[in-house]
Regions:
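Cytosolic juxtamembrane helix and N-cap/initiation of the first transmembrane helix
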Residues: 1-17, 133, 144, 148-151
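Interfacial segments of alpha-helical transmembrane regions
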Residues: 2-14, 67-88
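Hydrophobic transmembrane helix segments
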Residues: 15-51
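Core segments of alpha-helical transmembrane spans in multipass integral membrane proteins
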Residues: 43-66, 84-86
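Hydrophobic alpha-helical transmembrane segments
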Residues: 52-57, 120-144
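Alpha-helical transmembrane segments and their membrane-interface junctions
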Residues: 58-73, 139-152
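C-terminal halves and exits of single transmembrane alpha-helices
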Residues: 82-103
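Juxtamembrane non-transmembrane "cap" segments at the membrane-aqueous interface
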Residues: 96-117
Length: 152
């Protein structure tokens, strides 16, 4: 495996785990709106959503870190990465980009309007949704990870 691909994968995975663990808990200026997030979900729900969202990514990242010195990662680990980040890519399409670009989802649009009110956005609103900058960056990390997985 090319070292740059391995380090790129480890770096992107680490960023995504940090994002999943912290983005609903740590103030990030105009990149987040913690008051709106806490107003739409209870602390208990937020805790469990954070844990359950981060767990698969944290586990596969941890195993990749254990194998970081290996010349080539085991096939089972590569498969695990594909399942994890393939699901993440499908999830971003279903939750964000499909409703933004292709189909209307009024309930989702209203939820996003409340949760991400006042956050930084640079894309125009479509179908009632304007993806916030922080999630766009996260989605780019997911896409980057999938691209690097094709180079394993």
């Amino acid at each position: 495996m090319v070292p740059a691909v391995k380090f790129g994968l480890l770096g992107l995975q680490g960023l995504q785990v940090v994002f999943l663990l912290l983005h609903d808990w740590v103030p990030l200026g105009r990149l987040s709106n913690l008051k709106a997030v806490r107003g739409s979900d209870s602390t208990t729900k937020l805790f469990w959503v954070t844990v359950l969202s981060a767990l698969p990514f944290g586990l596969v990242f941890g195993v990749c870190c254990v194998h970081w010195r290996d010349q080539r990662w085991p096939v089972w680990l590569q498969s695990w990465l594909w399942y994890t980040y393939g699901a993440a890519l499908v999830g971003t399409i279903i939750a964000w980009w499909g409703p933004y670009l292709l189909w209307e989802s009024p309930e989702r649009a209203e939820r996003y309007r409340v949760r991400f009110a006042g956050t930084m956005k640079f894309l125009p609103e479509r179908n009632g949704i304007a993806p916030d900058t922080l999630h766009v960056l996260y989605h780019l990390c997911v896409v980057g990870t999938v691209v690097l997985l094709t180079m394993l």
